[in-house]
Amino acid sequence: MIAIDRMTPGSPPAGFSFARTGQGSEGKWTVTEDRTAAAGKVIEQTSTDRTDYRFPLAIHENVPAANVDVEVRFKAVAGKTDQAGGIAVRLLDADNYYVARANALEDNVRFYRVVAGRREQLEGANLRVSPNEWHTLGLRAEGQRFTVSFDGKKLFSATDKTFAGAGGVALWTKSDSVTRFDQFKITVLP
């Protein structure tokens, strides 16, 4: 588990680098106090740039892996264009990775492949994603199989072989989403 509780409020999260897919301004990632979070602190993306094709990334710096099981609690706090939070895996750079994301404005969970900065949906499910409530999003990548879970229940699996090698793991948001992240767990699989 990433030690968010040891991070300094008001500062960028330690052990992360930052990038953006698409257009618009860079994301603004900071550690914020939140009494509803397990650790009392969260990693939050606070930029409200409404550019539609804009995906801020907070990349954990110490996990290059192909096979991983990633889970994070997130809360969509605000956003007029979007209220989304997600997990990116096998991230080669800001324009090449896989992402599972949930969107409280659209009430859905989607799994995408991002190649050369362009998203392509591989799988998805429509379900209630309540804003301003904690939800748990999971993404397991093993070989060519990707399994997405939401609030502890498996939603769907997809297969793809575009990115087979090791890559980074990141937190992800879209457009003007103000999203908080808590209990970020990364398990490298054999």
Give residue spans per PLM region.
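Short strand-turn-strand beta-turns centered on an Asx-Gly dipeptide
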Residues: S149-K153
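Secretory/extracellular carbohydrate-interaction modules
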Residues: P9, Q45-R110, K174
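Short tryptophan-centered beta-strand motifs in secreted/extracellular beta-sheet-rich domains
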Residues: I4, V70-V72, N132-V148
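Extracellular/lumenal ectodomain signal focusing on beta-strand-rich modules
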Residues: A3-R6, G15, K28, N67, ...
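Local beta-strand/beta-hairpin segments that build beta-sheet-rich folds
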Residues: M1-A3, I43, R118-G124, L155
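Short, aromatic/His-centered strand-loop micro-motif at the edge of beta-sheets
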Residues: V115-T136
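Flexible glycan-contacting loops in extracellular carbohydrate-active proteins
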Residues: A158-D182
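Extracellular glycan-recognition surfaces and repeat-rich motifs
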Residues: S11-E44, R50-R54
